[in-house]
Amino acid sequence: MAGEKNFENRLKKYLQSVGVYPLGTAKDRMTVTPIGYYEKRWGGGYSKAGLPDMHLVVNGISIDVELKGPGGRPSELQKHNIRQINEGGSIALLLYPEGFETFKELMKGVIECRAHTQELNALKAASTSTGCDTLTG
């Protein structure tokens, strides 16, 4: 679990470096021009089980990320939900530390394209079978 938390903190630091801030961040705390937001989802209570750990909106494009530390395994419900999100036309990823650079490339495409295009769908397809798997089909 510590490995996943460390990876989550690394991801948050990267997101803020490109202008994706925690939802509700005050403008005067933003060090680069904002292009989106993220929110961390917490399990339990009134939350729906199996939702990805983080929800991001970058240039209007929704991205959901299920983080796993080294050796972590997604539940069947998590895999089902990721597939359903992708089949709905959004982007959902199962992200391991070894897939972080692939994730950054996907983010670069989202930031540069500013639209959900064929190129972004190709990036989703290219991520399959890596540490940054989109889990389609």
Residue spans of the language-model regions?
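Catalytic phosphate/metal-binding cores of nucleic-acid and nucleotide-processing enzymes, i.e., regions
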Residues: 1-137
